[in-house]
UniProtKB/Swiss-Prot annotation:
Its cofactor is [4Fe-4S] cluster; [2Fe-2S] cluster. SUPFAM superfamilies: Radical SAM enzymes (SSF102114). InterPro entries: Aldolase_TIM, BATS_dom, Biotin_synth/BioAB, Biotin_synthase, Elp3/MiaA/NifB-like_rSAM, rSAM. [4Fe-4S] cluster binds at C70, C74, C77. This is Biotin synthase. It catalyses: (4R,5S)-dethiobiotin + (sulfur carrier)-SH + 2 reduced [2Fe-2S]-[ferredoxin] + 2 S-adenosyl-L-methionine = (sulfur carrier)-H + biotin + 2 5'-deoxyadenosine + 2 L-methionine + 2 oxidized [2Fe-2S]-[ferredoxin]. Belongs to the radical SAM superfamily. Biotin synthase family. The gene is bioB. It comes from Rhodopseudomonas palustris (strain BisB5). Residues 55-274 form the Radical SAM core domain.
Length: 342
């Protein structure tokens, strides 16, 4: 009996160029999300193979360079000064310490170093050390990503001039549900910063969180908002809520059905076919089987390391074991996709 080259057969199913669209309707997106599960996953995996190596996952590491004391009231966040989470506020880290952490992350297999500061927006005096961090990470041959809150046009330009590759600024959920999660800023504020970042020539990392009390419609609308931007975010992180004691949402949060989470990953892959879709926070609550389904649905990026800002992460040894079981290898191309750029 002749053997069948399954990888080649699977790739043969993905022999066309993915269609990039910015005009998705509510009805179209909802129909995809609610499609029979096998059909949804098949479509997402087929589209995934048109632009990416299906067995390679991009690895990032995230560091909190300034913890706590944030003026925003995000209902899920332990770093908000509005909530009693017993998390002390810290000063901005010394850039040398940040760069030291980036070296360790690179040695562990990370190709992108993400740095987060718990601010509503950075003050002008904060920009010099932040820029030093960006330049230091870039000097290591890594991609640099920052999340600092809302930016002015000038701050975005300074970051671009320093060589920042990505700016993370999540929209969290749908516009309709947003005020149930955050009241100190508007959904429009988020979109305004995304526009400034893109205008400055920085790539955008933008996604959301599942488990905030939203409905499936909100998940669909969140992704439709991103897919209908003039330029798709180059990275789309999908987080599962980790309820943190002392935050308002923790008191009412209910776990997300695993299949609903996987459906969200698949919809992101289908509507934004050339973006990295990141399986982000919440992996400690996911079984290996659930993570495998997420990769099958088109997730191709994770955070490595033991922590994500103030929440736990599986750690390198568990991720290596999972990758070995699934035949996945870390993507070591410093952000250049196997079949083209995002």
């Amino acid at each position: 009996m002749n053997s069948i080259d399954l990888p080649s057969l699977a790739q043969a199913l993905a022999d066309s160029t993915p269609t990039i669209r910015h005009n998705w309707t509510r009805e179209e997106a909802a129909a995809i999300y609610h499609a029979p599960f096998a059909d949804l996953i098949f479509r997402a995996q087929t589209i995934h193979r048109q632009s990416f190596d299906a067995n390679a996952v991009q690895c990032n590491q995230l560091l909190n360079v300034k913890t706590g004391g944030c003026a925003e009231d995000c209902g899920y966040c332990s770093q908000s000064s509005h909530h009693d989470t017993a998390l002390p506020a810290s000063k901005l880290m010394d850039p040398a310490k940040v760069i030291e952490g980036a070296k360790a992350a690179r040695d562990a297999g990370a190709t992108r170093y993400c740095m987060g500061a718990a601010w509503r927006s950075p003050k002008d005096r904060d920009m010099a050390p932040v820029i030093e961090m960006v330049k230091g990470v870039k000097a290591l041959g890594m991609e640099a990503c920052m999340t600092l809150g809302m930016l002015t046009d000038d701050q975005a330009k300074q970051l671009a001039d320093a060589g920042l590759d990505y700016y993370n600024h999540n929209i969290d959920t749908s516009e309709e549900f947003y005020s149930s999660v955050v009241k100190t800023r508007s959904f429009g504020d988020r979109l305004e910063t995304l526009e400034k970042v893109q205008d400055a020539g920085i790539k955008v990392c933008c996604g959301g969180i599942l488990g905030l009390g939203e409905k499936p419609t909100d998940r669909v609308e969140m992704l439709r908002t991103l897919a209908n931007l003039p330029q798709h975010p180059e990275s789309v992180p999908i987080n599962m809520l980790i309820p943190i004691e002392g935050t308002p949402i923790a008191a009412t949060a209910t776990p997300v059905d695993p299949f609903e989470f996987v459906r969200t990953i698949a919809l992101a892959r289908i509507m934004m076919p050339k973006s990295d879709v990141r399986l982000a926070a919440g992996r400690t609550a996911m079984s290996d089987e659930m993570q495998a389904l997420c990769f099958l649905a088109g997730a191709n990026s994770i955070f490595i390391g033991d922590t994500l800002l103030t929440t736990p992460n599986p750690g390198d040894s568990k991720d290596r074991a999972l990758f070995a079981r699934l035949g996945i290898t870390p993507r070591d191309d410093l952000g250049v996709h196997a079949h083209g750029n995002a």
